[in-house]
Amino acid sequence: MKKTLLTAILLGASVAASAQELTFAMQPSYPPFETTNAKGEIIGFDVDVTNAICQEIQATCKFKSETFDALIPNLKAKRFDAAISAIDITDARAKQVLFSDAYYDSSASYVALKGKATLESAKNIGVQNGTTFQQYTVAETKQYSPKSYASLQNAILDLKSGRIDIIFGDTAVLADMISKEPEIQFIGEKVTNKKYFGNGLGIAMHKSNKDLAAQLNKGLAAIKANGEYQKIYDKWITK
């Protein structure tokens, strides 16, 4: 009996010692992917997906707030283990960091105030700083004068005040915005230019962290197979 108890204690200690604690960085001002609740806790689609993956690989997840344009530089400096913040997988980013398999299929859209600007009449466009949406706007839509924002919430304020005519961003994020701002509507068609977006969103890691990438991919495949991913998707994206 004593031997059995000792074995159980040692086994438990071994599991606890080997359990990973992983820190994921994100900018929590991008609902429905990441935001904060009334208690100041980071919540959202990315958080739930990460927690589900960590449960599958028997790791403990921690989340920390970072500005979006600092995610990749700080990841390269190994200040955290991974970044999950609705990051589009692009060739340019893949040269700097290692990506997991895509966990979400992304697209981009335009929004404007109802009855105001169209894609043809708009002159000033708002985008989030450091994103592929900013890169696309600067390179591909030279008919617009771009204005960058730390968050889309700031862009909304300028849209309402008339400082910008339209906003360009992730379709799901803009849909969440419209659900809270009834005077805003989608205009034009979705954009899926694979040079900038359309390859999906991925979890970013340091280039050398191939073991972690393999673990996260294994966990992602598991939650897609067991239905947990769909539950999370329905909770945050399907409304």
UniProtKB/Swiss-Prot annotation:
Q: Which residues form the signal peptide?
A: 1-19
Gene Ontology process terms (BP): amino acid transport
- Which Pfam families does UniProt cross-reference here? SBP_bac_3
What InterPro entries does its record include?
Lys_Arg_Orn-bd, SBP_3_CS, Solute-binding_3/MltF_N
GO molecular function terms here? amino acid binding
Q: Which residues cross the membrane?
A: none
Known Gene3D superfamilies for this protein? Answer: Periplasmic binding protein-like II (3.40.190.10)
Q: Which GO terms describe its cellular component?
A: outer membrane-bounded periplasmic space
Question: According to the lineage, what is the superkingdom?
Answer: Bacteria
Which NCBIfam families does the protein's record reference? 3A0103s03R
Q: How does it assemble?
A: The complex is composed of two ATP-binding proteins (ArtP), two transmembrane proteins (ArtM and ArtQ) and a solute-binding protein (ArtI).
Its recorded name reads: ABC transporter arginine-binding protein
* Record lineage: Bacteria, Pseudomonadati, Pseudomonadota, Gammaproteobacteria, Pasteurellales
